[in-house]
A protein has these predicted regions:
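Hydrophobic alpha-helical transmembrane segments of membrane transport/permease proteins
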Residues: 1-22, 111-150
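Hydrophobic alpha-helical transmembrane segments
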Residues: 2-12, 103-113, 160-162, 205-208
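Hydrophobic alpha-helical segments of integral membrane proteins
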Residues: 3, 7, 17-33, 43, ...
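An internal, D/E-rich "acidic patch" concept
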Residues: 13-70
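Alpha-helical transmembrane segments and their helix-entry boundary regions
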Residues: 16, 85, 101, 117-120, ...
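Short, hydrophobic secondary-structure boundary micro-motifs
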Residues: 19, 34-37, 103-104, 119-121, ...
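Alpha-helical transmembrane segments of integral membrane proteins
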Residues: 51-84, 113, 131-208
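Cytoplasmic-entry segments and transmembrane alpha-helices of multi-pass inner-membrane transporters
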Residues: 71-107
């Protein structure tokens, strides 16, 4: 009980909620973001160490969103009102409406619990134990160390989180790409290219 009371007093948890909020807000402006129970250290000390990994995940999600969004949008726009277009519309609506956390759980159920092909949790700590972390990016640090096993392990652990975070942006990019391509394919210069006898593949790549 004495230790509990001491901890409550240290973190102002023995005071009313509005007073706790005031202390928290004041701490934010002073650079004190609180205490991390997971890392057992101040958040201000943990944050810089985790920032690189967070940026790595965000960048990976952006790459996934761009690749899938542009690919799906182009494929659907070139096949207007056909099955690929309808499937892309469903994906776009799902991406715009499904919460990320729910979609992430769905991916875990399918690819980890049922199929067993996707890992969960952190990258294997044993692979990274002897690797220096000059950048803090697991994939980059593994490559710099010449440890391909660690590199692929990091990539493998990034796949599901990157898809989960990038799904919403994928839907938006796919819809924008589809709309832009459909509009371009209705232009006169595209009709002229088709009239010249160019293959649809060439029309899409060079003229649309």
């Amino acid at each position: 009980p004495l230790e509990v009371a001491e901890i409550k007093a240290r973190f102002n948890m023995d005071k009313p909620v509005w007073v706790q909020y005031f202390f928290w807000l004041r701490g934010i402006f002073q650079g004190d973001f609180g205490w991390s129970g997971v890392s057992a250290a101040p958040v201000s000390e943990v944050f810089p160490n985790k920032l690189a990994a967070t940026m790595e995940l965000a960048l990976s999600a952006g790459i996934v969103a761009l690749f899938l969004g542009i690919s799906l949008g182009t494929y659907a726009g070139a096949r207007l009102n056909r099955l690929p277009d309808h499937i892309t519309r469903i994906i776009s609506v799902s991406g715009a409406s499904l919460p990320n956390f729910w979609f992430g759980i769905l991916l875990l159920i399918v690819f980890w619990a049922n199929l067993g092909i996707a890992p969960i949790g952190r990258s294997d700590a044993m692979l990274f134990g002897s690797i220096a972390h000059p950048t803090g990016l697991y994939t980059v640090d593994a490559l710099l160390a010449g440890n391909l096993k660690a590199f692929w392990d990091a990539i493998w652990h990034l796949i599901l989180p990157a898809i989960t975070l990038g799904f919403g942006a994928t839907a938006i990019i796919a819809r924008m790409m589809r709309s832009a391509l459909v509009e371009e394919l209705q232009q006169d210069y595209v009709d002229a290219a088709r009239a010249k006898g160019l293959a649809e593949r060439i029309v899409l790549k060079r003229h649309a």
